[in-house]
């Protein structure tokens, strides 16, 4: 039955039960309502507790600083917690601040917030009261209905049965208790609706009867369909059995054939397996024999292992002893290396001191050389005066030649001879120290002819060819000879007391014999190993002389390159060059004899200042790097900077990449060298001192370039004007 609030309330017992069960049913209905009221009370109490906790949480949110009270601005922090605007939150704060002091304590906030919340929820509480009242009325109504059902009479039961029989409801309704209960309730409470209810039952029962008839018809049709389906299925089963039987016979036939073929195949396999078994048996016997032999070998190996372990222990002890000895030897070797290093340093210092002393001695000798040149000039003047006096005496003393007496005195020939000796000695000094004499050496490196004083014409001495020699190499040459050497015939030993005959003087004066430039005494051993290059050109003096300086890092192959170029041979294991060394090589360049003075410089850092001094007088520079050493190529720019600082860009530079024969270990590609040469306007070649590849070609290219450059300079000089002839130092 529907309750006044729209809810459907189920009855506690079904219709048709005894009337004595009515009080139990009403009690069952009252008990849940009482429990519902208690539950609502508990829910209300728990809601109040939840609100108190929520109010405390809101207070803590507002009082983030822990002051113990909240102000009006702190109330705005609840904007994210509650669906209220800032103005509404301020209104709530004003409502909670009853005393108007501008802040709220925890007690005021909790009490006021709870009161505010419950005041907002009063309408819902009133609705809950109305629901409780409705539930009470429903409870009373249900209890009364149960009492009325208990007082139903037998006549009403008979009338209900007659109605059901008239309608034929027994065939349709299985349980009439619910309909009976509704009919009795309508008859007692609202009898005017009873006829409508009976009409409703009549229509319902007639519809149910029609539905029952349709159901029976459908069941009959379904049974007929099932029978036809069963017959068809039976027919299909029979056909399938026939097919299965035929297929089974065919399968058995094929299976028999397969079985026979399989049997034959298995028999053959069995024979093969038996043969394999025999082979395996034989192999097993053979393996057993090998296993037995291996066991014997194992025992022997164990014995050998035992011996080897003992031997290994002995060797380990010997190794340990050897290692101790090796450590001692290494310590001794380190001490020897340290001593060798000290000796090397001392040797270098000694070499430096000797070199410095040589420089000082060189300066002293240069001063002596200047003095001797002045003396030579004075002697030439005296010789001219003697010539004039002799001519006058010849005219005055022609009558008294027979009575000419012999006298002793100085003869100009003595001075001339001594001057030749002095000149020879000065030239020897220049050979030792590698100092070119600008007044007596030509472009080719050979001395010019002797000139008469003041005229610039060649003297009677003629040319004095002398091959160029290289400077001292401190590493290769012993130095004590320099300290022991000296002049064999100093100026003070020139004799002036020789007597000559009358006729001898007359013969000497008009003829003016040539000056003797060869020293009267043999020379001492020159300092250093002065190796000469093979002269490939004609014995005549070269037309040009160019000074070329080799630079580059140590061990790039400069000395080996020079030896290959000059001597056409390669000497492995050469030591590094110390100081400066040079060689001379004459080439035929375009039908012209060109002498190349090749200066080999040391690549070590400590000789850098010495190397830079030779750039100033160089006609060309060759910068060499190692193709197998990238660091030597990286140092090329530094060498080019040194050359540019010393001579600028007026000197042509040849960039050589050595060790082309060692192509497998190449670290510098050819493209990098070509790029560097293009950027700095250099001549670029890759060569090999070991095989001689591009050694002559590269220097021939540089010599031709220097010759063309000098020809260009000469042509420009001729166009400007002929320069005045240089006077000799003695003129």
Curated annotation (Swiss-Prot):
Effect after changing residue 604 to L: GTP-binding mutant with reduced GTPase activity but increased protein stability. Increased ability to activate JNK signaling pathway. No effect on its localization to the microtubule organizing center or Golgi apparatus membrane
PANTHER family (alphabetical): RAS-RELATED PROTEIN RAB
GO terms for biological process, alphabetical: activation of store-operated calcium channel activity; adaptive immune response; endosomal transport; positive regulation of calcium ion transport; positive regulation of JNK cascade; protein localization; response to histamine; store-operated calcium entry
Binding sites annotated in the UniProt record for GTP: 554, 556-560, 571-572, 577, 603, 658-659, 661, 689
EC supergroup of this enzyme: hydrolase
UniProt cross-references to Gene3D superfamilies, sorted A to Z: EF-hand, P-loop containing nucleotide triphosphate hydrolases
Protein name: EF-hand calcium-binding domain-containing protein 4B
Disordered, as annotated region: 1-45, 426-466, 494-528
Region (Switch-I): 572-580
EC number(s) stated in the UniProt entry for this protein: 3.6.5.2
Binding site for Mg(2+): 559, 577, 600
Top-level lineage group: Eukaryota
Gene encoding the protein: CRACR2A
Record keywords, A-Z: Adaptive immunity, Calcium, Calcium transport, Cell membrane, Coiled coil, Cytoplasm, Cytoskeleton, Golgi apparatus, GTP-binding, Hydrolase, Immunity, Ion transport, Lipoprotein, Magnesium, Membrane, Metal-binding, Nucleotide-binding, Prenylation, Repeat, Transport
Region (Switch-II): 603-619
InterPro entries: EF-hand-dom_pair (IPR011992), EF_Hand_1_Ca_BS (IPR018247), EF_hand_dom (IPR002048), P-loop_NTPase (IPR027417), Rab (IPR050227), Small_GTP-bd (IPR005225), Small_GTPase (IPR001806)
Region: Proline-rich domain (PRD) which mediates interaction with VAV1, residue numbers: 349-540
Impact reported for residue 658 to I: GTP/GDP-binding defective mutant with reduced GTPase activity and protein stability. Failure to localize to the microtubule organizing center and Golgi apparatus membrane, instead shows a predominant localization to the cytoplasm
PROSITE patterns reported for this sequence: EF_HAND_1, EF_HAND_2, RAB
Cofactor(s) listed in the protein's UniProt record: Mg(2+)
Protein family (similarity comment): Belongs to the EFCAB4 family.
Lipidation (S-geranylgeranyl cysteine): 729
Provenance organism: Homo sapiens
MF-aspect GO terms: calcium ion binding; GTP binding; GTPase activity
